[in-house]
Design a protein with these regions (language model features):
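A cross-kingdom feature marking solvent-exposed beta-strand/loop segments within repeated
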Residues: 73-77
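An amphipathic, aromatic/His-enriched active-site/gating alpha helix that lines ligand/cofactor pockets
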Residues: 59-67, 81-83, 89-138
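Primarily extracytoplasmic ectodomains and periplasmic/lumenal surface modules that are beta-strand-rich
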Residues: 39-44, 96-98
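Sec-dependent N-terminal signal peptides
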Residues: 3-15
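Acidic/histidine-rich, surface-exposed loop or edge segments in extracytoplasmic proteins
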Residues: 25-40
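Boundary of Sec targeting at the N-terminus
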Residues: 19-20
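Short amphipathic alpha-helical segments
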Residues: 43-68
């Protein structure tokens, strides 16, 4: 009897958790992407980002998949453990659009015919990073 109850309980937990954390489908969905470059490489990272990644994001805005993309950097320094160099904020059309499969590979081939050079520069862009993390954002109503 206890085993049966435990099995039923375990099958219900994922359903309740997914309902609790599911973003609202029709509203814009915001994700912040943080980049922490190795010391002395932030400018190189920015140059490679603008050359190879930003055009992909801009194209997706033009396609309507994303509503807006922008980059911020801190005005002042922080402690090393909390340091980040760039934050890219992407506003997706909705949460479904953010997670549904998207053929970014064909877009890369369209924008960057020299795939060998593109791959090499993208590898470099990530090699000079100390950290990268993504944070989906949920607005809090203060009223």
């Amino acid at each position: 009897m206890k085993l049966r109850f435990l099995l039923v309980l375990l099958t219900l937990i994922p359903v309740s958790l997914s309902a609790q954390f599911a973003p609202e489908g029709g509203k814009p969905f915001v994700v912040e992407y943080y980049y922490k470059a190795k010391w002395g490489y932030a400018d190189e990272f920015l140059q490679l980002f603008k050359k190879n990644h930003y055009p992909l994001l801009k194209k997706q805005v033009e396609m309507g998949r994303m509503l807006k993309v922008w980059m911020d950097q801190p005005r002042y320094h922080t402690t090393e453990d909390g340091r980040w160099d760039y934050r890219v904020t992407i506003v997706f059309k909705n949460s479904a659009t953010a997670i549904e499969p998207f053929d970014e590979e064909s877009l890369k081939k369209q924008l960057y015919p020299d795939q060998a050079a593109y791959q090499k520069e993208e590898q470099r862009r990530f090699a000079i990073l100390d950290g990268h993390w993504d944070v989906p954002i949920k607005s809090v109503d203060l009223q």
